Amino acid sequence: MEFKSPVYHVIAVPVEKIKPNTYNPNAVAPPEMRLLYDSIKADGYTMPIVCYYDKEEDIYIIVDGFHRYRIMLEYRDIYEREKGMLPVSVIQKPLDQRMASTIRHNRARGNHDV
C-alpha cells in the first residue's frame, strides 16, 4: 500500500466530536494564546488539528492542535464564524506512537513537561 500523508485528506469535524488527549506536554502562556486567537481571527484556521479517530467512541482525539481547539471552545466569535467545525487531519497509530507523534509535533513550540 502506498503511503499518503494525512494532510491530503483534511475533513471538517464538529468541535463537539473532538477531545483532548490525556498526555499533552505542551503549555502556552496567556499572551501566546491571545496571539493565536488574533491569528485565527485574522487568517482563519490555516493548519488542521491532527487527530486519531476512536471508532468505539465515535470521537477524534487530538495529537496536535490542542490550543487551536481551545480557541474554538473559548471564543464564541470564532465558533460562530467557523460554524463549530474544525479542520482535522487523521492519523492512525497505536497509543505509544501517538504520544511520540504529539511530542514531535510540539517540539518546536511552547514548554514541554516531558
How would you describe each model-predicted region?
Residues M1-V15, D38-S39:
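N-terminal leader/domain-start detector
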Residues F3, K19-M47, E57, Y69-V114:
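Amphipathic, charge-rich alpha-helical segments that serve as recognition/docking helices
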Residues Y52-D54:
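Short beta-strand micro-motifs enriched in acidic
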Residues G65:
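Short, conserved phosphate/pyrophosphate- and ester-handling motifs at nucleotide-, phospho-/glycolipid
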